[in-house]
Amino acid sequence: MAKYFDVHPENPQPRSIGQIADAVRSGALIAYPTDSCYALGCRLGSRDGIDRIRSIRRLDHRHHFTLMCRDFAQLGQFVRVDNDVFRAVKASTPGSYTFILPATREVPRMLQHPKKKTVGVRIPDHVVTQALLAELGEPLLSSTLLLPDEEEPLTQGWEIKDRLDHVVDAVVDSGDCGTEPTTVVDFSGGEAEIVRRGAGDTSRFE
């Protein structure tokens, strides 16, 4: 059964955040809220976590996983960003955007796109997620919690606990969450290519 953490949306309890971070460090797969919608997350490089996310969402090997980063300094450790792209990404973070960029050697090969050697990165504008990332001290490997054959992500922590109780290790609930995933922008070719229109405004990239 998954552990259930009821976390205050504006003033996250340090004890709960610490317990969630400890669980992630120990290999747990968690469901947690973001500024766009709920996500599945595990420790960077957790083969078991990656396999479980693929199984829950029925993803193939071409799926771009996302590294949920605390800030731009951390993001820069895992992707290569030239000056023009830097300005565009910097102006849009934190926020509901995922950027696909060339991966550095810090990113395990199993997380990189098999041909492009890219990875998704983002910096969330969400108090609870930021508290968890600060406590964890490293990015969370993440994927939108969108179940197969469903059009929208789940929005309520209790519903996620009820439906995924035996396939995730912890559920973080900080109240109602959105249903719209991030806007995905691919900068791996140098120019902005909008891969998915979502919660983030796309006009600045068009």
Give residue ranges: language-model regions:
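Active-site-adjacent structural elements in enzyme catalytic cores
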Residues: 1-206
